[in-house]
C-alpha cells in the first residue's frame, strides 16, 4: 500500500512539475505586443496623390487570393499610410506601442519608385529607424516591364535583430528596408498599375 501511495505521489508530482514547465508560445513577454498574424484581417494602404490631395484606400485582406490594384501615375508623388486592422478594430496603435519590435519592408519588384519614410516620433524606433507606417512615394515608372507583373510586397517583421532603412536594387525593382532575424507578422501584396 505504501508503494502505491508513494508511486501516486511521485506521478502527481511529476505531472505538476511538467505542467509548470510548459508555457504557451508567446513571442514576447510585453503585453503591448500581442499582435499575432492570425489576428490581422486587413492591411490597408491610404494613398494620397499630393497634386490632388485625394486619398484612395486599398484593402488587402489577409490570406486573400486576389490582390488590390494600386493605381499610380508616373511623375506623381504620393503620401502613403499603412493601417493594420483586426476586423473593424484598428490594430496600428498596437504596432506603434511596440514600435521597437516592428519594421516594414517595401519591395517593388517591377517598379521605379523612390520611397522615403516619413514616420513621426510615434512610429520611430529607439534606434532611430522609422517603422515605415508613413511614407512618401515618388513614382518614376509605375510599371517598368509591361510583360511582367508590377507589385508591392509589404512585409511587417516582428522582433528583427537589426534593421536599416537602406534601399537595394532587386531584379527589376527596389527593396526599401533590410532586416536580420525576426518573424513575419504580416505580408500584403498589391498590384501596381498605371
Tell where the protein language model's regions lie, with residue ranges.
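Bacterial Sec-dependent N-terminal signal peptides
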Residues: 2-3, 17-45
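Short beta-strand elements
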Residues: 168-194
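A beta-strand/beta-hairpin structural motif
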Residues: 60-66, 118-144
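Extended, polar beta-sheet/loop recognition surfaces of beta-rich domains
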Residues: 27-30, 91-131
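Short, solvent-exposed beta-strand/turn "edge" segments of beta-rich domains on protein surfaces
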Residues: 34, 67-76, 143-144
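Internal, hydrophobic beta-strand segments that form the core of beta-sheet-rich folds
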Residues: 79, 84, 144-173
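Bacterial N-terminal signal peptides that target proteins for export
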Residues: 1-12
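N-terminal edge beta-strand
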Residues: 47-73
Amino acid at each position: 500500500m505504501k508503494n502505491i501511495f508513494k508511486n501516486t505521489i511521485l506521478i502527481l508530482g511529476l505531472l505538476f512539475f511538467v505542467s509548470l514547465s510548459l508555457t504557451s508560445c508567446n513571442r514576447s513577454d510585453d503585453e503591448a505586443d500581442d499582435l499575432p498574424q492570425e489576428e490581422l484581417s486587413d492591411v490597408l494602404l491610404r494613398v494620397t496623390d499630393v497634386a490632388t490631395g485625394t486619398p484612395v484606400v486599398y484593402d488587402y485582406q489577409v490570406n486573400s487570393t486576389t490582390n488590390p490594384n494600386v493605381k499610380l501615375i508616373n511623375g506623381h508623388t504620393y503620401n502613403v499610410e499603412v493601417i493594420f486592422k483586426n476586423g473593424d478594430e484598428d490594430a496600428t496603435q498596437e504596432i506603434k506601442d511596440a514600435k521597437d519590435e516592428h519594421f516594414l519592408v517595401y519591395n517593388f519588384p517591377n517598379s521605379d519608385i523612390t520611397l522615403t519614410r516619413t514616420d513621426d516620433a510615434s512610429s520611430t524606433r529607439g534606434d532611430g529607424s522609422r517603422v515605415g507606417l508613413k511614407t512618401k512615394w515618388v513614382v518614376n515608372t509605375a510599371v517598368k516591364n509591361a510583360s511582367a507583373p508590377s507589385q508591392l510586397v509589404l512585409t511587417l517583421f516582428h522582433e528583427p535583430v537589426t534593421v536599416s532603412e537602406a534601399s537595394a536594387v532587386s531584379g527589376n525593382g527596389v527593396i526599401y528596408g533590410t532586416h536580420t532575424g525576426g518573424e513575419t507578422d504580416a505580408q500584403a501584396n498589391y498590384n501596381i498599375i498605371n
